[in-house]
Every structure is written in C-alpha cells, then in structure tokens.
C-alpha cells in the first residue's frame, strides 16, 4: 500500500542553472543510474521492484547495479554511471560515511545525485540534490514509545535485547538513537544485549540464539527490521519460549511476513518503513532533468501497527 509522501519545509534547491541532459541513451529518454544496497531482506526486494516497475512505467531507462552490501561496489557503480554519462544517479548508501570523493566526481561531471532510503553524513549537502526516504530516528522513537506505553503500569525492570542493522548504516544508527532517546528517560528500561545481525533473517536467528544462551531474562526484543525479527522468532521458539508473550517483539519495516507474524501473536508491534519509493523517485528524476526546483528532504509518511490491527491490514500489504 503506497503511503502519501510528506514534503518537509526545508528550503527548495535548484538542480542547476540549466536543465540536465538526458544521458547517454542516444535519444531523448532519461537515463537513471541506480545503485542498490543489495537484496538482504524482503523490504529491499520490494524496494528494488518498486524502482524497476516505476522506471518502466515512466519511460525512464534504468541502469541498475546491486552492491551486494559492499560500499566499494557502490562507489565503482557510481563511477561507471559517471563514465556512461547517465542523466541522473540515485543510490541507497550501504553506510553513511565515505562518499564525498565519488559524489564530488559526479558533481564535477554535472550529474545530479538523489539519495534514496538512506542518507550520507557529508557536511557538503551540495553533493546531492535531495534525500527521499524515512525518518529513521523517528521510527526508533515510535518503537520505544510503544514499549513505554505497554510498560506504564509496572515498575519492574524491562530487559531489552537489540538486533541492530548493518554497522554504520543510517537506519541502524538512527533507529538505535531514536529508541535510546526515549527509553533513556526511565531507568527501568535496560538494554542488556545489543549486536548487529546485518538486517538478515539468518543472522537474526544466529545472534538471538547467542543472546538467549547468555541471557535467560530477556523481556523484549527490539529488531531494526522485520527479517531479523523473524529470524529471532525461530530462535525463541527453538528455545522453548513463546515470541510475543514470553518475549515481546518490536520490529520495523512492515512486510507481509511480519504482519502475518503479528496476526499469529508472535510480533507485538511493527513500525512501518515504506519501501515503495519508485514512483516518487521517478517523479523527482523528471523534475531534476527538467531543471525544476526540488525539496532537499522528502519524508515518507508511515504508521505504527499492533496485533489488533494486523489481521485487517494484512490483505493490503503488497511486500
């Protein structure tokens, strides 16, 4: 289900004094070079499909590169796009840092860059035109706010295990930051175990097994994405515990599999992160090529879903 997009009140930026060229396709067709993080999760697969389908529908030629979770692969892909003289470059950064050099190369080549899903930590914001994606800090806050509300009638200590996303990635850093920002106000909330599980189901299970071996007093699992949460559910069940009851589970993304797990009582709450960015990305790409002003930040509007909403919402999940 596509969510509407909210445009922040950031100042508008112009792509260039003149319209950007259409790229090296040899026609008037716009060429978009896109470097994807990888295919590490159901969310990412849905994101890729959304971009591919939207490009075809918009008549935009898409040059697609899968970075396989490696920054060096993305840098290589961006340099290839520069050499190919594409009209626009878009990418979802594997990690937040280390992009200035290659983005400066794109800027020098007068090829505008769009960030999708994830941000970069560059101090020079002129290196990209806009950032389209979720507010990951707010997602972390929403996850924590649910836990605070669910725990408000007890003064007992709440022991939390955290499955982090890829180390150094914007969603992992920001979802942790937002969550801690909220729970840090009450000393009864304690993170007793926290480790990366690389946003994958297999690692989610593996790391959760280690958590359970070291800590038999975990009350809550906070997973930075659904795939890690679903892997952790397997580990919890194999340990003879009931996910959603013995250990409450908070996850982020909103995939169909997670909604099914919520409907089954195994996940307690999911904070939505919408992967269907393709149509908006193509709209932005056309604006950039035409030289139209573009907001510096475009934030997706997303919800929070609990078990009592899961069954009704499940048929609407398209990913």
What kind of feature is each model-predicted range?
Residues 1-31, 56, 104-111, 318-319:
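Short, low-complexity disordered leader/linker segments with a strong preference
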Residues 31-58, 62-80, 84-86, 92-96, ...:
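Extracytoplasmic "Venus flytrap"
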Residues 32, 74, 131-158, 203-205, ...:
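Hydrophobic alpha-helical segments within soluble ligand-binding/sensing domains
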Residues 43-58, 139-146, 170-189, 203, ...:
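Short, solvent-exposed amphipathic alpha-helices that sit
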Residues 64-66, 122-148, 162-163, 194, ...:
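Short beta-strand elements at the ligand-binding edges of bilobed clamshell
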Residues 91-108, 179, 193, 197-260:
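Hydrophobic alpha-helical
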Residues 101-138, 159, 255-261, 312-315:
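Flexible loop/hinge segments that line or gate small-molecule binding clefts
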Residues 163-167, 171, 182-183, 273-319:
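Hinge/cleft segment of the Venus flytrap/periplasmic-binding protein
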């Amino acid at each position: 289900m596509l969510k509407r997009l909210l445009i922040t009140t950031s100042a508008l930026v112009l792509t260039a004094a003149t319209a950007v060229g259409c790229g090296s396709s040899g026609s008037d067709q716009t060429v978009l070079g896109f470097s994807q993080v990888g295919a590490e999760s159901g969310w990412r697969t849905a994101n890729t499909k959304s971009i591919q389908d939207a490009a075809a529908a918009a008549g935009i030629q898409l040059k697609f590169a899968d970075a396989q979770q490696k920054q060096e692969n993305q840098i290589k892909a961006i340099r290839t796009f520069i050499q190919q003289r594409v009209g626009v470059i878009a990418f979802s950064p594997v990690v937040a840092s280390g992009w200035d050099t290659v983005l400066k190369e794109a800027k020098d080549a007068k090829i505008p860059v769009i960030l999708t899903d994830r941000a970069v930590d560059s101090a020079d914001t002129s290196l990209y035109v806009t950032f389209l994606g979720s507010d990951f800090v707010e997602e972390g806050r929403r996850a924590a706010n649910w836990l605070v509300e669910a725990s408000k009638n007890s003064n007992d200590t709440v022991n939390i295990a955290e499955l982090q996303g890829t180390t150094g990635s914007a969603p992992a850093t920001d979802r942790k930051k937002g969550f801690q920002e909220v729970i840090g106000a009450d000393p009864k909330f304690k993170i007793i175990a926290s480790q990366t599980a690389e946003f994958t189901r297999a690692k989610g299970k593996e790391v959760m097994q280690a958590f359970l071996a070291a800590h038999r007093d975990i009350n809550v699992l906070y997973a930075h994405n659904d795939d890690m949460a679903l892997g952790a559910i397997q580990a919890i069940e194999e340990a003879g515990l009931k996910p959603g009851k013995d250990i409450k589970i908070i996850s982020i993304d909103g995939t169909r599999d997670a909604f099914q797990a919520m409907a089954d009582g195994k996940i307690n709450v999911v904070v939505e992160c919408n992967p269907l960015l393709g149509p908006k990305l193509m709209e932005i790409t056309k604006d950039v090529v035409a030289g139209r002003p573009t907001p510096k930040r475009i934030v997706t509007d997303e919800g929070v879903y609990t078990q009592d909403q899961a069954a009704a919402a499940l048929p609407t999940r398209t990913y």
